Amino acid sequence: MQACTLIARAKINLYLEILGSRPDGYSEVAMVLQSIHLADRLQLKSRPHGIHLTCDRPEVPTDARNLAYQAAELLQKECHSAAGVEIHIEKHIPVAAGLAGGSADAAAVLVGLNQLWGLGLTVGELQSLAARLGSDIPFCIQGGTQLATGRGEVLEPLADWEGIPVLLAKPKHLGVSTAWAYQAFRSRREILGATAPSEPALPTLPQALAALSRQDPPALARSLRNDLEQVVLPEYAIVGELRQALLSAGALGSLMSGSGPTVFGIMPSLELAAQARDTLRRQFQDVEFWVTQFAPTGILLQPDPCSLSPS
């Protein structure tokens, strides 16, 4: 194989609870991650040596700051490969949006180069390497619906729930740093401690898992939770405004994804999602909207099916 094309799907967080801090500086979390059909498209082509990365979005770095570039470097080092690769990223997932766009691209490079270079790594081996680059990348490799614990790299697949309509909303000129959001949450928890004002009762992980097991959209909507909203919403008022706007437009439930600023609404139907998108576009002219759906997988290798061995 000399070249391949991959579809790298975005993710949303249906549930994100921060349990505490870890000695390694990360946060201990419990999350439910869900792939959606909004996706980047990557083209990989063999070259004699070196890594050359291009992207159709000028704001995306094309050097070692890019996770996709780092993924190729990591495989070269760990597999003692002198082979090179040309990587082109066609971006559709917004940058710094809480949708794991960079992580999905890195996952696609790991999957694609495993095929292109004939490395024969299992999914489990790829996910172990992926965890060294970022906490969302192991999930992005397989995708679907999964419970993530630890710092997000310990995964437990849940029953796939395909086709649930989702409406995404992201302020065009706003990005939120994941590192800032987690640090702000830790600082808030340390400062407030036991004196923190009582919060309204938050959904729990068992409630979210029960809704998923029953495949009950209204119950899922009631169990949506993202602890990072506690620091992002006070800092960026537009995020809270968009959450409320999605609910007013008919969403069963609405939540910020990851560290934001993207918010999503679980919609009753694709038709209502499209109607809400058109209405909200007139109301929020500096916000991008996408209608999408839950997806059952993460990385899709085209045109041939992925031949990774299960771990």
Swiss-Prot record:
It comes from the Bacteria. ATP binds at residues 94-104. Keywords: ATP-binding, Isoprene biosynthesis, Kinase, Nucleotide-binding, Transferase. It is an enzyme of class 2 (transferase). One of its GO terms (molecular function) is 4-(cytidine 5'-diphospho)-2-C-methyl-D-erythritol kinase activity. One of its GO terms (biological process) is terpenoid biosynthetic process. It holds the Pfam family GHMP_kinases_N. Its EC number is 2.7.1.148. Catalyzes the phosphorylation of the position 2 hydroxy group of 4-diphosphocytidyl-2C-methyl-D-erythritol. HAMAP family: IspE (MF_00061). Belongs to the GHMP kinase family. IspE subfamily. This is 4-diphosphocytidyl-2-C-methyl-D-erythritol kinase. The lineage of its organism: Bacteria, Bacillati, Cyanobacteriota, Cyanophyceae, Synechococcales. The gene is ispE.
